């Protein structure tokens, strides 16, 4: 199991800032564990003027995709065969797969770690972002992933983000993927939730403080190894309400 993921929300106490990442190791899991534990923190430190050099194993490497949400802006960076795909009014807008990666010291003459980075404003028709490893994208197209996840993510009563991730993982596995699969869903638009019988709008900035991420990883034989479900505001608040009953 060489896939790893990470999430940091409420950066510096600001609910409008968050960073997410999916990392895929090759030639050993340590190369994925290192950026998963350090890269997002290093990005945050770099933003505030601090520098910290990553220490990684000379053997092995990792591809990764990260998404930083800050004050209505979205910064997506990709190095390797992970991918970020955004649903824009139901249309898939995806990042490029670039021949880059972290580690792989023996290949540094040919493989660089500098990611491909895109910066955009989060608009009203930007619905959600899918971060996933190549275990998904080798078997599922960008538009197909959006089409499958969208009904789960745009439900009025409560988004079923974990179910959407599981659906995507199951589909890739059913098509013969023997690789590790990691999928993360990040809601970007206001979500309407029902609380005490009243429909309320929850903006994406507030959602960052409530909704973290969903990631599912599977082993090579297709069995679920672990999943982190801290889905969306509807998902969490529904469980808070259930606990109160």
From Swiss-Prot:
Annotated PPM-type phosphatase domain residues: 1-188
Family annotation (PROSITE patterns): PPM_2
GO molecular function: protein serine/threonine phosphatase activity
Entry similarity comment: Belongs to the PP2C family.
Name assigned to this protein: Putative protein phosphatase 2C-like protein 45
Organism: Arabidopsis thaliana (Mouse-ear cress)
